[in-house]
């Protein structure tokens, strides 16, 4: 028997975008990060869904992120840290789909180093 109260379901969508950033306060050991440099930023969004036939559709969610959210993520000359970019994506998801579901957004530099932010409606 399924204990549906204990099960949580999620959809996961991914994509990437080209961007530039710099870390102006970089420690001396990584001083090269103080200068503007390019990455392929890869993002992953994990979104809670409320039944096993998903009320959200992969393609539609990805389209909302690409068309309505990403312009605000990449509009800056310095995109900031992966965590700052993830925060902007999360803010867009909260605006699009509401605060009553769990979200996790991960942004990576070239698929190597990640920053993650979560929204947990249970806290």
Language model features: what each stretch is:
Residues 1-123:
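Charge-rich, low-complexity N-terminal segments
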């Amino acid at each position: 028997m399924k204990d549906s109260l204990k099960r949580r379901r999620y959809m996961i969508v991914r994509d990437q975008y080209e961007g530039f950033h710099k870390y102006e306060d970089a420690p001396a050991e990584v001083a090269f990060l103080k200068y503007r440099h390019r990455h392929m930023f890869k993002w992953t969004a994990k979104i809670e869904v409320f039944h096993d036939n998903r009320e959200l559709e992969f393609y539609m969610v990805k389209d909302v992120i690409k068309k309505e959210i990403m312009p605000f993520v990449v509009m800056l000359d310095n995109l900031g840290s992966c965590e700052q970019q993830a925060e902007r994506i999360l803010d867009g998801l909260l605006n699009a789909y509401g605060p009553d579901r769990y979200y996790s957004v991960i942004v990576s530099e070239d698929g190597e180093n990640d920053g993650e932010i979560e929204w947990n409606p249970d806290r």
